[in-house]
Amino acid sequence: MCGIVGAVAQRDVAEILVEGLRRLEYRGYDSAGVAVVDSQSNLTRIRRLGKVQELADAVDQAEVVGGTGIAHTRWATHGEPSEINAHPHQSGDISVVHNGIIENHETLRELLQSRGYVFESQTDTEVIAHLVEWELRTAASLLEAVQKTVKQLEGAYGTVVLDRNDPSRIVVARSGSPIVIGFGVGENFLASDQLALLNVTRRFMYLEEGDVAEITRREVAVYDALGERVEREIAESNAEHDAGDKGQYRHFMQKEIYEQPTALINTMEGRITADSVVTEAIGVNAAEILSKVEHVQIVACGTSYNAGMTARYWFEDIAGVSCDVEIASEFRYRKFVTRPNSLLITLSQSGETADTLAALRLAKEKGYMAAMTICNVAGSSLVRESDFAFMTRAGVEIGVASTKAFTTQLAALLMLVTALGKQQGRISKEKEKEIVEALHALPKQINAALSFEKDIEALATDFADKHHTLFLGRGEFYPIAMEASLKLKEISYIHAEAYAAGELKHGPLALIDADMPVVVVAPSNDLLEKLKSNVEEVRARGGLLYVFADADAGFEGDETMKIITMPHVSEITAAIYYTIPMQLLSYYVALIKGTDVDQPRNLAKAVTVE
């Protein structure tokens, strides 16, 4: 959730650190800071509340010099957003930045106070700085002091330590919070996200759980949780250097909405032919594993959970395999029964979602036949720890509110469902061809849906002064309504809820009045007549209706019901298609309200803590 950047180089690194933080702004933060040391052990620490630009201005004014440094954007967990709670934190000559939550920080704080340490902040991170300073008094090196320190920490952390008396190195430790190391020529770097470093390197190594690494200009030495020197794979990144550029678009979210046709084409490339799904392209041993699956368990959070809920209908309707979907933060804390030959599927854009990662680790202990992930970030923890990974190819997603990651997850899930049904002989060649042809048609159809932008922008004015909104859908369009509701509340701060339309009479109907917009996702399908009855229930009570439907659905609008007529598309991919107008609606409502579309308040892009 926070952002970390570090560098050890011959050149001054302050500009590299600040630029790295700029590239991580999308993750969400409330304050930022840097600590830089030069070859004469002169340390400069600057922290600012607010945007990275305020930190950048202060760094420029101070003319910060030095070839070794660490930087951080903070998203408050312990202690209010303030300059004194901003990172880096210091203890004597030690400076520390940290992502995560130290669960035993209160116990450690009491211990350190008994040793005479005085705390200036309310954060859990400051205990790390004091512990390292204490251990360094007897340790042979900063590396040893950090190794001794992390053994005392409980919880999740990615932490980086700098000693002003040893400006040739920094030490980083990872447990539950991602850290990537970037390799340069005569200089090395680290960050919580490779995007921060794409302007200085393309060669990356991901630390694994329990790793501690010592980074100098010429070497990166990695040690595992037992203190043994280990080698980790170094890989070349193909991520775009200019991924952090909005180009012609006003916001990253708008850009990413428009990138969806290309993202879908990239995700499908090599995975489907003209008339079939290429099972082998889904993952190593996918064909063998899928042939044995009797049950699917999907675990995810947020938008990814909504994708899983949509896919549940597909697994059971198309592949004939039972499927459960659960929120990761609930799944990991309850006792559950593992069904025979169950496949666990985790969904995550970042591959670092803390609850989803913990759920994966728990499930692997509980006898699941196999664990796969559908993920957008190669080399992420979920990808490394799963038995096989089906990578979406959405490209870097900057906006906190997910768009192209969601639709590419849905496309990946539909391909997986088809492969599963195919391997088990549950779908015919004709059905497989129908699904694949619908997928091939989808990018062009989404391009057409984007042409409704101006109409939806005009529609958004009806919502901007409202305090509540309901979204309704049936079948696989209920989770699409859930996703639409999530988008609206995330970026416009309007309270929004989604309901299966059949639940209206069980409570939500009491909310209907002339100030309550009700958005209905209503393509023509076998549930349409049922849905029309629900629409009439809202009309009869004076509700404001906004119905997204194709011409075949046969809705007729009036002063209380606006019809947004969409082109007819295949029922197979309609759930993906109808996501697009919902995204545009949320975007334009937020734009009219003047909220921060790309970095909505209190939210972060990658939720790497509980």
From Swiss-Prot:
Catalyses:
D-fructose 6-phosphate + L-glutamine = D-glucosamine 6-phosphate + L-glutamate
Q: What class of enzyme is it?
A: transferase
Q: Where is the Glutamine amidotransferase type-2 domain?
A: 2-218
What keywords is this UniProt entry annotated with?
Aminotransferase, Cytoplasm, Glutamine amidotransferase, Repeat, Transferase
Q: Does the keyword Cytoplasm apply?
A: yes
The cellular location(s) given in this protein's UniProt record come to: Cytoplasm
| One of the record's GO cellular component terms | cytosol
Q: Which GO terms describe its molecular function?
A: carbohydrate derivative binding; glutamine-fructose-6-phosphate transaminase (isomerizing) activity
Residues of the active site are: 2, 605
Chief location bin: cytoplasm
> Which Gene3D superfamilies does the entry mention?
Glucose-6-phosphate isomerase like protein, domain 1 (3.40.50.10490), Glutamine Phosphoribosylpyrophosphate, subunit 1, domain 1 (3.60.20.10)
InterPro entries recorded:
GATase_2_dom, GFAT, GFAT_N, GlmS/AgaS_SIS, GlmS/FrlB_SIS, Ntn_hydrolases_N, SIS_dom, SIS_dom_sf
- EC number(s) of the enzyme? 2.6.1.16
PROSITE patterns in the record: GATASE_TYPE_2, SIS
Its biological purpose = Catalyzes the first step in hexosamine metabolism, converting fructose-6P into glucosamine-6P using glutamine as a nitrogen source.
Subunit comment for this entry? Homodimer.
Q: What is this protein called?
A: Glutamine--fructose-6-phosphate aminotransferase [isomerizing]
Species of provenance? Vibrio vulnificus (strain YJ016)
